[in-house]
C-alpha cells in the first residue's frame, strides 16, 4: 500500500490544471453566498463587490504565477511563506489554510444536503452529508489522476451551466423570455431600489468583500496542483491567465442576471438565488435541473477542497511541521492518512445542518474568508521577497518563465488592500467571528511552533527541499 519513494505523482495534464482552478471557485460562495452579498450590498453594490474582489484576486494570481512556475511544489504558498517569510509563518499559513479547506469541505457537504431538501425534504441533511462525504473520499482515494479526471468533468458541467444560466437569464431580463404568471419584464428596474443605488450605503459594499473573497477561494488551487502536474513551467502560465479572466466573466455576468431579476430584499443563504431566479422565469423543470447542476458544482468544490487540504497536510508533515505518519502515501501517490483526518475534521462543520443553520453557515464562511485573505496576503509578501532575493543573487528577470508585472507595485498593492479587508471585519457584527476565531488560532500557531516544533525541526532538510524545487 505504501509508496516507498514518498513522492507525489506528476500525472495531471494542462486541461486538468485549468479546470481544477476554475472549478474550485464555482461553488457555495457563488451559488449560495451570493444571496447574502446581494441582500447586504444591494444590486449594483453586489456587482461592484465582485468586480473589486476579482481585481484583488487578479493581483494575487499574478504573484502566485511567478512563484508557482519558479517553484512548482505541492505545498505551494505554504512552502513559499516558509522560505521567504520565515518557518513560523509558513507553519501558521499552512495549518490555517488546511483548517480553512477542512471547514469549507464541511460547508459544501452541508450545502449539498440543503439543496437535496428540494426533492426529498423528509431526509435529514446529515444523511446527505454522509453519503456525499463517502463519494468524494472514494474519488480522492483512488489516485490523483482519477481525482483530476473527475474534477475536469465536474467543472465542465458547472461551467456549461453558468453559461446557460447567463443566456436564459439575460434573455428574460430583456423580455425575450416571458416570466411565470405573466410578471412584467424587469429590464433594469431592480437596480434602482426604494433607497437608491446602494440601499445600505457604499460601505456595505466593502463589508461584503469577505464573503466575496470566500467565493474566489479556490483560484490558488492551481499552485497546489502544480506539484502533481506534467511540465508545470509550460502549463501553469496559461492556466493562471485563463482562470483569472474566465472567473471574472462568469461571476460578474451571473451576478448581473441575479440582481436584475431577484429583488435584493428576497435574497438570502438558505435557498440558492440561482434556483429562485429560474423558478421566476418558469421554464419547465429548469429549477430542478439547475438544482442538480449546483449540487454537482458544490460537490466539485468539496472534492477539490479535500484534495487541497490533504496535500497541504502532507506537505507540512513532510517538512517536519506535522506528524510523520501523515507523510505516508499509497502506491498511487495518495496521502491516505491526511485524507482521512481532513474528512473527519470536516465533519465538525456539519453543525451548520443541525443548529441555527443560517447563522452558523455565515460564521463558517467568515472564518474561511478571513483565512483566505491571510493566505493571499502571504502570497503577495512571498513574491515581493522572492523577487528581491532573486535579483540580489544575480538573477535576471527575463529568465523567469512567468513574471509579475509592475513589481513591486502589484505585491504591495495586493497586500495592503487585503489588509484593509481584514480590518473591515471589525465593523461587521455578523463577520467579527472571523477575527474572534482567526486571531487566536494565528497566535496559537506561532506559539506552538516556537515552543514545540522549532526545536525538533531539521532546518537543513527543509532548505534542501526548497532549493531542489527551484
UniProtKB/Swiss-Prot annotation:
Recorded GO cellular component terms are:
membrane; plasma membrane
Q: Which GO terms describe its biological process?
A: amino acid transmembrane transport; arginine metabolic process
What drives induction of this protein's expression? By arginine.
What is this entry's stated membrane topology? Answer: Multi-pass membrane protein
Cellular localization per UniProt: Cell membrane
Give the transmembrane ranges.
Answer: 18-38, 44-64, 90-110, 119-139, 159-179, 196-216, 243-263, 281-301, 338-358, 360-380, 409-429, 433-453
Q: What is this protein called?
A: Amino-acid permease RocC
Q: Which Gene3D superfamilies match?
A: Amino acid/polyamine transporter I
| Record PANTHER family | GABA PERMEASE, GAMMA-AMINOBUTYRIC ACID PERMEASE
Its keywords, alphabetically, are: Amino-acid transport, Arginine metabolism, Cell membrane, Membrane, Transmembrane, Transmembrane helix, Transport
One Pfam family per UniProt: AA_permease
Task: Determine if Cell membrane is one of this entry's keywords.
Answer: yes
Quote the gene name from the UniProt entry: rocC
Entry's family note: Belongs to the amino acid-polyamine-organocation (APC) superfamily.
The protein's role, per its UniProt record? Putative transport protein involved in arginine degradative pathway. Probably transports arginine or ornithine.
A GO molecular-function descriptor: amino acid transmembrane transporter activity
The primary site where this protein sits is: membrane
